[in-house]
């Protein structure tokens, strides 16, 4: 049985494995990485901008002049947040040099594990595209931001990328009987790393604590959305009653009669009359 990769303990255990990280980055970005350091919960001191960010996994490869960030999306994150993360890493490079020459390429890879009704895509790549006046592209900035969503994998998904999307999806949806491409040695290794029985007692405890906390936050967000919908419906009902009141006012109907017909207060009807 697999442990779910939408849990940060399991997620970090998998993607901090050097072999897994190298294969995954190669399959998604095409880049070779040989990290000198692999950090978790990476932050920058002092913080860049007004937000003190934490990056799930941060790998630095000075040989290939490459930095790779990997982030798991929690329920409350959105695309703009990770654009900020991506730019923060670039800005950190600038802060660490005397001049503005960056010297390294930054790739940020974001895992979205929930369904996205707006962008139903398996892989979205965002890059800084520079175009000259004649229409020619100029490769000024190599940095890229990748969004992966296993819910929208298909036959058109590149096979190597699909293997990783299926691993994440199956660990969440079918952990007891996952359907994976175990013909690939690296996928077999990845599967072994996230076997539920292979978690240490400490990893298991932290994973359960985190899941409980995130479930609590998700319930709070759901409650907030429901309250927002109720407020929206109530506001819509009131606006409809106001429209009726305006029409009756235009016909010269008395305030008391309008109040009885719409349920609006006489004071509000008086404001509508003045407005």
What are these regions (language model features)?
Residues 134, 151, 230:
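Active-site cofactor/cluster-binding pocket
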Residues 1-5, 9, 62, 66-71, ...:
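Short, charged alpha-helical interaction segments and adjacent helix-coil junctions
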Residues 14, 28, 112, 151, ...:
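Generic structural signal for hydrophobic core residues of well-folded globular domains
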Residues 143-156, 167-171:
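C-terminal segments that line or cap access tunnels to active or ligand-binding sites in enzymes
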